[in-house]
């Protein structure tokens, strides 16, 4: 007897491909869906090979396969957001925006239109029930854990979402793929932003919004002009390489001012801070933070969680006070909270205090 219909987001990669197999083995009726998200004007359909890989996997596993076009929503909510943030002197995380508005909103809604009871992805996270609520828990594979990107999920989404890969090590996923004869078993993991395959975000923005990129001044902490920069989009907090200025000592970007179009330069010690304000906060084990909590938090995907106090503020904001100084806290990135293995929530870094 079927456990229900699952709409699986297929990317053509090994994780979503093996997820299809696992779900089918567990008794679900799987529908494979590939999202056509964007087209590179220089190359045409940028991900044709990925779509074909996904289609071949679906044929191999004998599951229905569909391609849906979400280009406009992806452009409006991810690409335009990405560009606007850089032009505003912030460093965005497009994967967080994509999960919030595309994978777990647009795709979630598409799954319902296909008559699915659940949606599934190839993300490395676990979904469990604790104290009567669905929560997100770190994956079995610490190196592949993707909970940092998932803090925006709501209860209604978690109740209908399955992430099979969270229960496996990556090597095991590849092993399953090879054993069942999937050609994608040795396909490389994507490391770059999907719509910037050459990893040159500055070049991407320049091609699309060249007129908005303005040269400006490098200034020191006292406001003294010490050089010229080529546009604030090319810089991020903590950056040392590629500044093109010689001060006779290591120089770091410590702030970016979009109003004056200035990039502030300082010493390495200046990029270590302990406090921040985050906006657009979402919590998963509970609806609202009523009082301060002692948790662990991290300010970038690759960082280790560090002890911090999370203090509720008005307008869906929190203040985060770390026990130890954090390197290069960056506006536009996400700060994410954990209680041991459980993802508690997160928000967008708005201000460094």
Curated annotation (Swiss-Prot):
Enzyme class: transferase
One GO cellular component term: cytoplasm
GO molecular function: ATP binding; tRNA binding; tRNA-uridine 2-sulfurtransferase activity
Swiss-Prot/TrEMBL catalytic activity: S-sulfanyl-L-cysteinyl-[protein] + uridine(34) in tRNA + AH2 + ATP = 2-thiouridine(34) in tRNA + L-cysteinyl-[protein] + A + AMP + diphosphate + H(+)
Cystines in this chain: 98-194
Domain of life, per lineage: Bacteria
Residues at the catalytic site: 98 (nucleophile), 194 (cysteine persulfide intermediate)
Purpose: Catalyzes the 2-thiolation of uridine at the wobble position (U34) of tRNA, leading to the formation of s(2)U34.
Family note: Belongs to the MnmA/TRMU family.
The protein, known as: tRNA-specific 2-thiouridylase MnmA 2
